[in-house]
């Protein structure tokens, strides 16, 4: 029989990484964008997807539906491994405003070669954005097409919980917001 003094944690309340989204926005189509796609492919081992501009911005020289960015979604153990590399570059320090109210967080790095990818002069150096979506067991009911459910208010992830999870799991430091 279990100890009465020791309270067990509910396994359904435990936080985990649902997905890690990596994004490189070049701001133009062409050779630089294909080189950025190579960087993401080297990092994740998956084929990245190109993002199109929503509307024309003449001052930036961007036309509507022009491919301007490349992104990739990683899940599972590979997501945790890549996130660990990214946080190591940031020295496990995030700001309070890096966390959203729904318990997700994101950050960026200046140079992809800090992640351990060998520098290739033909590719160059790119910065990239990391965005982490956290979840709990049972969150998939909100994603179903048939018999879709809603996540109850008590089961949702809040900003404080995500910050506490980051501090405990990665021994991270949360700096005050700007």
Curated annotation (Swiss-Prot):
Q: Which GO terms describe its cellular component?
A: cytoplasm; nucleolus; ribonucleoprotein complex; ribosome
Any one GO MF term held by the record is: rRNA binding
Q: A biological process (GO) annotation for this entry? A: protein localization to nucleus
Where does the record say this protein resides?
A: Nucleus; Cytoplasm
Task: Say where the protein is mainly found.
Answer: nucleus
Entries under Pfam families matching the protein: Ribosomal_L5, Ribosomal_L5_C
UniProt entry keywords in alphabetical sequence: Cytoplasm, Nucleus, Ribonucleoprotein, Ribosomal protein, RNA-binding, rRNA-binding
Chain segments annotated as transmembrane = none
Origin superkingdom: Eukaryota
Which family is this sequence assigned to?
A: Belongs to the universal ribosomal protein uL5 family.
Mind telling me which PANTHER family this protein's record contains?
Answer: 60S RIBOSOMAL PROTEIN L11-RELATED
General function of this protein: Component of the ribosome, a large ribonucleoprotein complex responsible for the synthesis of proteins in the cell. The small ribosomal subunit (SSU) binds messenger RNAs (mRNAs) and translates the encoded message by selecting cognate aminoacyl-transfer RNA (tRNA) molecules. The large subunit (LSU) contains the ribosomal catalytic site termed the peptidyl transferase center (PTC), which catalyzes the formation of peptide bonds, thereby polymerizing the amino acids delivered by tRNAs into a polypeptide chain.
Subunit details for this protein? Answer: Component of the large ribosomal subunit.
Q: What is this protein called?
A: Large ribosomal subunit protein uL5
